[in-house]
Amino acid sequence: MEILKYPNEILDKKTKKVKNPLDAEVQKLIKDIKETMEKSDGAGLAAPQVGESLRICVIQYGGEVFAMINPKITSYSREKETHEEGCLSFPGQFLPIKRSVKIKVRYIDESGKEIKKKAEGLLSRIMQHEIDHLDGIVFIKRK
């Protein structure tokens, strides 16, 4: 799969909710996103970055690679930190971005199970960045 580079109109659009997470096409898309992300040495990759307007993203953190289907951040900490971020759709660009240190997120995993997770630090930042992609927000709009 090819990673779309900005500007591309799909990167500015809110994605559609996945109706059936266990659908064969959805499962294949997740597998393809994982492979593309790993080849690109990314920490995360969202479906719109590969041309699919669906609420799916894949995260690589702490030796684990997992998909989030229809993720929703249910709470943000008031405490925020600014750190440099990059994005596979913006090769070579790194910008200081302010984000919440901790979040709570709800999503469906690849097996169709609903997950509620608390994240902080780098994992929280990666999740916020990827979920932004699903909402049509690219990181340069956060600076």
Could you tell me what each predicted segment is?
Residues 1-143:
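Positively charged
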